[in-house]
Amino acid sequence: GWMVTAPSMSPEHGPSGEDTKKASTIVAGCTMDNQIIFDVLSNALHASRILKMSASYQDSLRSMLNRLAPMQIGKYNQLQEWLEDLDNPNDKHRHISHVYGLFPSNQISPYTHPLLFQAAKNTLLQRGDEATGWSIGWKVNLWARLLDGNHAFRIINNMLKLLPGDEVKEAYPQGRTYPNLFDAHPPFQIDGNFGYTAGV
């Protein structure tokens, strides 16, 4: 069987698919956990080669890597957020943790994993562009990683619209930036600013 984290949860988000009846947010082996563990083990293996660590230690890392649950494509051609196919294509939640493998990690590439690449793109299309600042900043980077500079630029343009007043009065306001160029969110989200600059 696969090695997975348990208990696990996809940050601030639980399955709300058609068949889940708002199931528990606690699951086993959500996709983001598996992606982060893949990076940790891969980096440890790389370091162990450089440091000429024992063959048995390197073999144990390889064995764990080979037993991790793989990323999976669901019935809506999306990258699954959970081991089970529980995603809802109408879910517009701002958290998109399961595309960590696309960015900031580099596990999903159009050259090595074209089907996962398309599934990650489908996930972003299903979730939409509206979100709070930190999530918008991340989406700029995700669309850039998806080789769609026009989509990333559209998000940047929306992000840099000035807020009509001096405070945020709704979840997703028309303006996303204060006059001082801080990302608009009560009080503000510096992650949005940092995400934007990383995407550029």
Predicted region positions:
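Active-site core of glycosidic bond-cleaving carbohydrate-active enzymes
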Residues: 30-199
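Acidic/histidine-rich catalytic neighborhood
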Residues: 1-47
